[in-house]
């Protein structure tokens, strides 16, 4: 029997579940097909949320184990209970996934547990998790199948000794030596977790810099900070092979520019070279769709080239970020419902949850220089911010880039304490096409770290008062 819906959403990650919930809010009959045992996709289950739980716990452990607590007059002798740390992480994740289930019930979203395959225009077949099959039809179908860890030739992931990001969140012991392949966001965040818990960490990167998409000045500052924390970086390095055994892994390395092979030993290796869109077995050919050379599905305003098929999140162009997928989900469903909706792709923030944190939105200096666009720069260091200094968290800075003529804010780059919670103000400013002067004229509470943003805006015009 064919079950009919207004909208079928394939995938229940941040893009998929938000699309389904919004469709339900708008009164559409909606089904969400997800084969995982729990809702939330990679982000809630094996990505954003569990990694943040471990980052928070490991940061507290490192503060208690090192000199930070003693400096404040707090003397403790902490003992690591890794099993309990993992348990609280799992409990937090479970609570979040149950929350999505509640929202599905609240907004009358039908969760069909299984794996979807397109069967031509407006039709979807589902291999149900319980072994059966279901046939569905809808006027509109939203593909939100997300992404998976990208493989590295010659380095086979077994999640015993050679790990992907999921495996690195589940280790039952602290590695003696963890080698991380890839100095991007995922690699650096998970490196931070295990370094804080006592592992020796070596980060290998093919390029000559960390975090290729990050503003260069910010990336260099972050690398220096992580190096002081004990991480070792080997840039311009290519991994050509890996052999794992019961006791560890042997890696064969070469200079990226070419040269002699050398060996490196580790007891665990994390492969974190990025992610790729996941569309395997989706039946794209039945609706005339094909992915591009990057594996992504093209879209115009979230519409694919196939009638009635929409794409959001990691399977389409743009940064692979949960909040970007959520934004696309809202735009997609509003358009399906016949409403006007737009997304400003220039105002999608990015955050790295290391210590110090990194956050940015908009264009960087390298991009502006490549475009031959004239711009002004305002900087303010956290070492001159009163709240950061009294908290002994004065590493980093805020940098604002504005148009040389109009003063419109073009990009904001932050590295320092709590900047993940501050970048939102910059996003609002850019969404409203604010100038640096607009930020400079806005009163900020004292003493707060957010004052550094105002001072950076003042510095665009040479008027910073506290540095």
Predicted regions and their residues:
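Glycine-rich flavin
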Residues: 2-5, 21-174, 202, 207-211, ...
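Flexible, glycine-rich terminal cap/loop adjacent to redox cofactors
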Residues: 10-15, 19-36, 42, 49, ...
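Short hydrophobic core segments
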Residues: 8-10, 116, 135-146, 180-181, ...
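A structured beta-alpha segment of the ubiquitous adenosine-cofactor-binding alpha/beta core
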Residues: 127-134, 239-240, 252-263, 275
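Gly/Ala-rich phosphate-binding loop of Rossmann-like dinucleotide-binding domains
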Residues: 20, 24, 191, 195-196
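Beta1/beta-strand and adjacent pyrophosphate-binding region of the FAD-binding site
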Residues: 2-13, 174-184
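FAD-site-proximal beta/loop scaffold in flavoenzymes
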Residues: 158-174, 263-335
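N-terminal Rossmann-fold NAD(P) dinucleotide-binding loop
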Residues: 16, 187-188
């Amino acid at each position: 029997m064919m079950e009919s819906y207004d909208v079928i959403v394939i995938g229940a990650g941040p893009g998929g579940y938000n699309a389904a919930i919004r469709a339900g809010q708008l009164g559409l009959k909606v089904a969400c097909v997800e084969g995982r045992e729990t809702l939330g996709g990679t982000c809630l289950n094996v990505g954003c949320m569990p990694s943040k739980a471990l980052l928070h716990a490991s940061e507290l452990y490192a503060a208690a184990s090192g000199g930070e607590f003693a400096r404040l007059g707090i003397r403790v002798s902490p003992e690591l209970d890794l099993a309990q740390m993992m348990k609280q992480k799992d409990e937090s994740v479970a609570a979040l996934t149950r929350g999505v289930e509640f929202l599905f019930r609240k907004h009358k979203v039908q969760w069909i547990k299984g794996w979807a395959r397109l069967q031509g225009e407006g039709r979807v077949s589902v291999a149900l998790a319980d072994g059966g099959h279901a046939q569905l039809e809808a006027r509109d179908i939203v593909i939100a199948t997300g992404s998976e860890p990208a493989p590295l030739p010659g380095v086979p992931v077994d999640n015993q000794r050679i790990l992907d990001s999921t495996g690195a969140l589940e280790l039952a012991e602290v590695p003696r030596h963890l080698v991380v392949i890839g100095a991007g966001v995922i690699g650096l965040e998970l490196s931070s977790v295990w370094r804080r818990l006592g592992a020796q960490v070596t980060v290998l990167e093919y390029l000559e810099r960390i975090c290729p998409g990050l503003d260069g000045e910010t990336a260099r500052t972050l690398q220096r900070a992580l190096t002081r924390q004990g991480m070792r970086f080997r840039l311009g390095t290519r991994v050509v092979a890996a052999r794992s055994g019961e006791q560890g892994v042997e890696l064969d390395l070469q200079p990226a520019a070419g040269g002699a092979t050398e060996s490196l030993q580790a007891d665990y290796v994390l492969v974190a070279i990025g992610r790729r869109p996941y569309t395997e077995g989706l039946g794209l050919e039945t609706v005339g769709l094909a992915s591009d050379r990057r594996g992504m599905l093209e879209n115009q305003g979230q519409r694919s080239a196939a009638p009635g098929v929409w794409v959001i999140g990691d399977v389409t162009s743009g940064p692979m970020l949960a909040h970007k997928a959520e934004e696309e989900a809202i735009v997609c469903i509003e358009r399906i419902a016949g409403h006007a909706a737009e997304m400003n792709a220039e105002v999608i923030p990015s955050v790295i949850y290391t210590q110090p944190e990194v956050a940015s939105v908009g264009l960087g200096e390298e991009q502006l220089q490549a475009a031959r666009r004239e711009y002004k720069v305002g900087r303010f260091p956290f070492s001159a911010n009163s709240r950061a200094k009294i908290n002994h968290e004065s590493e980093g800075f805020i940098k604002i880039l504005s148009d040389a003529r109009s003063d419109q804010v073009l990009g904001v780059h932050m590295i320092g304490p709590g900047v993940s919670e501050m970048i939102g103000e910059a996003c609002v400013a850019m969404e409203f096409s604010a100038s640096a002067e607009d930020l400079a004229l806005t009163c900020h509470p004292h003493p707060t770290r957010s004052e550094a943003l105002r001072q950076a805006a003042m510095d665009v015009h040479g008027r910073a008062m506290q540095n």
